Amino acid sequence: MFIKKIKAKANNNEINVIIEIPMNSGPIKYEFDKESGALFVDRFMQTTMSYPCNYGFIPDTLSNDGDPVDVLVVAHHPVVPGSVIKCRAIGVLMMEDESGLDEKIIAVPTSKLDITFDHIKELDDLCEMLKKRIVHFFEHYKDLEKGKWVKVTGWGDKVKAETLIKEGIDRN
């Protein structure tokens, strides 16, 4: 995959997200090598937890941690790693870990991909239990890894998410 050829924005209101980890998959952390385009096993997670949403990144961006901007894509189905999915940002999970700030954009598929998310415009439109699962996952998925930790500091709205995306595009 030629990751560098994929733009961050599909259009003004849509972002491209490259999926690295499907929702509900085994406790394996995958990461794309941005130079080669190969999908590597980053590590086997020591907790027996699975990602509550599809997890990936926005290409052609750079976040404060030196990696592309991270995204959780809320969907009804797992998405195959390497797939590019057009999404709308609806908010952001604010968190930090042993390496510093590590925000996660929360997004939903565009109307063309799945009309069942058309009513989701912001975080408050998501099921409260899903938000609790997301927080629980990130608060605990590194619990058994020595020297690693996560602190969830709250949620940011759609405007905050769009600001982080724009900063990520500008930084790259």
From Swiss-Prot:
Annotated binding of Mg(2+) 2, by residue: 70
Major location category of this protein: cytoplasm
Keyword Magnesium found: yes
Gene Ontology cellular-component annotations: cytoplasm
The EC number(s) this enzyme carries: 3.6.1.1
Pfam (any one): Pyrophosphatase
Subcellular location: Cytoplasm
Binding residues for Mg(2+) 1: 65, 70, 102
Reaction catalysis annotation: diphosphate + H2O = 2 phosphate + H(+)
Uppermost EC category: hydrolase
Binding-site residues for substrate, renumbered to this chain: 29, 43, 55, 141
Cofactor(s) essential for the protein: Mg(2+)
BP term (GO), one: phosphate-containing compound metabolic process
Any GO molecular function: magnesium ion binding
Keywords: Cytoplasm, Hydrolase, Magnesium, Metal-binding
Subunit field text: Homohexamer.
NCBIfam families reported in the protein's UniProt record: PRK01250.1 (NF002317)
PANTHER family found in the cross-reference section: INORGANIC PYROPHOSPHATASE (PTHR10286)
Its job: Catalyzes the hydrolysis of inorganic pyrophosphate (PPi) forming two phosphate ions.
Family: Belongs to the PPase family.
Name assigned to this protein: Inorganic pyrophosphatase
Native source organism of the sequence: Rickettsia prowazekii (strain Madrid E)
The organism's taxonomic lineage, starting at the top: Bacteria, Pseudomonadati, Pseudomonadota, Alphaproteobacteria, Rickettsiales
Gene assigned in the entry: ppa
